[in-house]
């Protein structure tokens, strides 16, 4: 389910049960020992628990005399939004990308290593979010878009009244460009690398600079330089 309203997202985060999940590796005399609500794998001498941090701490204190070795792994604290289950997406999701729940990923999209996509964002069919790019909360990315490495599509959750960023179909955003809150980038436009876009970008135009300004209309030469490679989107 896609959440697109800022107040709805804020309420979802407020009401969500905050979680600190841990992975607990334990050796010792573990026969009959369990952690409430946890999933366990292993033997009576060595187990791995997937558990809540607080309950895991209680377990370790209570059974300290029966535990010989312990190792704890965790990657979040009081987290409100889980990661999106990407197993059934018809898209290419590379390792090291972070996609939060309540995000929509279109068919044949490509999410590269280090990319971050926040709650309420939508990624269109055939769109590539390149390495270390960020799509903030409620960001709407159309079809066959390329968001370059390190680029930022600003999120709009706070203040909640702000209009989300909208990137229309066929847009190319160069590396390390920044698209600020409320901006709409028109169809088939090109945003040059390193640009900071503070105003709407007309369809079919090329913008560059800080702040970004229209420098020309997209011509045949620019189209050749910015064309997408379909093979990168094949599954």
From Swiss-Prot:
Its pathway, per UniProt, is: Amino-acid biosynthesis; L-lysine biosynthesis via DAP pathway; LL-2,6-diaminopimelate from (S)-tetrahydrodipicolinate (acetylase route): step 1/3
Give the GO biological process terms: diaminopimelate biosynthetic process; lysine biosynthetic process via diaminopimelate
Q: Which UniProt keywords are present, listed alphabetically?
A: Acyltransferase, Amino-acid biosynthesis, Diaminopimelate biosynthesis, Lysine biosynthesis, Repeat, Transferase
User: Do you know which Pfam families this protein is assigned to?
Assistant: DapH_N, Hexapep, Hexapep_2
Q: What does this protein do?
A: Catalyzes the transfer of an acetyl group from acetyl-CoA to tetrahydrodipicolinate.
Q: To which protein family does this belong?
A: Belongs to the transferase hexapeptide repeat family. DapH subfamily.
- NCBIfam families in the record: DapD_Ac (TIGR03532)
Disulfide-bond pairs as recorded: none
The name of this protein is: 2,3,4,5-tetrahydropyridine-2,6-dicarboxylate N-acetyltransferase
The EC number on file is: 2.3.1.89
Catalysis: reaction(s): (S)-2,3,4,5-tetrahydrodipicolinate + acetyl-CoA + H2O = L-2-acetamido-6-oxoheptanedioate + CoA
Amino-acid biosynthesis among the record's keywords? Answer: yes
GO molecular function terms here?
tetrahydrodipicolinate N-acetyltransferase activity
Q: CDD domains under this entry?
A: LbH_THP_succinylT (cd03350)
Entries under Gene3D superfamilies matching the protein: Hexapeptide repeat proteins, Malonyl-CoA ACP transacylase, ACP-binding
Under the heading InterPro entries, the entry gives: DapH, DapH_N, Hexapep, Hexapep_transf_CS, Trans_hexapeptide_repeat, Trimer_LpxA-like_sf
